[in-house]
Amino acid sequence: MSTPAGGAGGPEAMSRRQLLRHTAWFGAAVVLTVTGGEVISHIGGTPTATAIAQDPHALRFVQISDSHLGFTGSANTDVTGSFSRAIDQVNALGSRPDFVMHTGDLTHLSTSAQFDQVRQMLRGLRAGAVFTVPGEHDSIDDHGQRYRAMFGTGTQGDGWYSFDIKGVHVIALVNTLALEKLGHLGTDQLEFVRNDVAGLSADTPLVVFSHIPLFAMYPAWGWGTDDATQALSHLRRFSSVTCLNGHVHQLFTKTEGNVTFHSATTTAYPLPHPGQGPGPVPLTLPAGRLGAALGIRDVTYRTGRHTLAIRDQKLA
Amino acid sequence: MRQLGTTLVLPAVAAGIVILAGCGGPAGAVPGTAVPGTAVPAPVSAGQAMPGMSMLPAGAPGAAAGPAAPVATDAVSIQNFAFSPATVTIRTGTTLTWTNRDQDPHTVSAMSGAFHSPTLNTGQSYQHTFTTPGRFDYLCTIHPFMTATVVVAP
């Protein structure tokens, strides 16, 4: 298991040179905001996200997650409506994103009808491309076969893949198939990661997507990946690695050495903070409060300037 | 080995929803529902982006009974991401009924493969008749941190 949240593995785990480069690329321009101009967290960041977005050479992508189409509980009686609003919000961003990544739990029950619905809705996104990784709700009882039939084109193994775009190397992992309490990647996928980055320069910024966190956010609820440490060991030589996950339905950020993890929120319903309550039980918020717990995330990376901005926006 | 007597029954949907509604929003106002002694790693940043969440532990008191003494019953509730009772002791030939009272889907799946429910959505039940003595550990395949045991006496 990787280092527990808040534990060891701090800056001493990386060389000073790595730390400086990492800080220059990431720490200097992490921007977490919400819509309406209300700034939640703003760390350094001379270049604002808006300025970066106007740079034609900038990479801009959006992460959406955990739409759970088919969920009907009181925590959100209209997940289709909120996912639709999330798509509208992506389409209303200042510039068309290079790609949109849905980090899993597209559906609630892995039914063909739910997969059809989510694919249809994703077609409404105005973006250069749309990618997905599966959540455990997308692979119920069939090891992800229905998911891959619809979203697995061009992927390897059980649905993992990678690509390069505007100087950034993107890796999309599948850690929801061989669940044993925690998320699991497996030897084939670990080998894929090792080979995938073998030829890359250590200066290449890496962005890694998975559904379940690659760090130990709260293992008692399955919020971690048991062999993530092995995958991350192949990424240790890179100056900057950004891991973006879903699954936990809430924002959370953590840095371990050269790797920064960002859990995204959901478009469906919130879950409790780690350990609050008996389990990851969907939260039914007071009337009018749900929208503030849901959202989308847009990320911008400007080549050359080595700046990256992450903005988390509440669902409008 | 698939055993006889496995059926899926679909009553009690309304009952499940009523129970869930009862432990939803209003539960946040009930004092003393927070679980003591659980370590909560503080969000490094942006935890504030979820106003109101911290005041909603929303747990049904008592449903998260830990590893308690074995209980003789023929009904197991799936609630708050736990099988309750966590261990049941029955006689050979008994039919157990599991009912999902969560908003999330769950399964009842023996680690040995001896039985395996379909996906149980809110309010759905699953029955299995135990025809051989022994100890059966099982879990939810969607949330495999949910584990429990059936002990079948001769």
What are these regions (language model features)?
Chain A
Residues 201-217:
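Short acidic, glycine-rich surface-loop motifs adjacent to enzyme active sites
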Residues 69, 107-108, 138, 214, ...:
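Short active-site segment of divalent metal-dependent hydrolases/proteases
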Residues 22, 29, 38, 42-116, ...:
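N-terminal active-site segment of His-dependent metallophosphoesterases
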Residues 175, 209-214, 246-248, 312-313:
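Short, well-ordered beta-to-alpha junction loops that form the rim of enzyme active sites
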Residues 1-18:
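N-terminal secretory signal peptides
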Residues 71-73, 106-107, 176-185, 215-220:
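Surface-exposed cleft-lining segments at the edges of enzyme active sites
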Residues 52, 111-205, 227-242, 254-265, ...:
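Extended active-site neighborhood of metal-dependent phosphoesterases/phosphodiesterases
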Residues 64-65, 100-104, 131-136, 209-210, ...:
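Active-site neighborhood of phospho(di)ester-bond hydrolases with catalytic His/Asp-centered motifs
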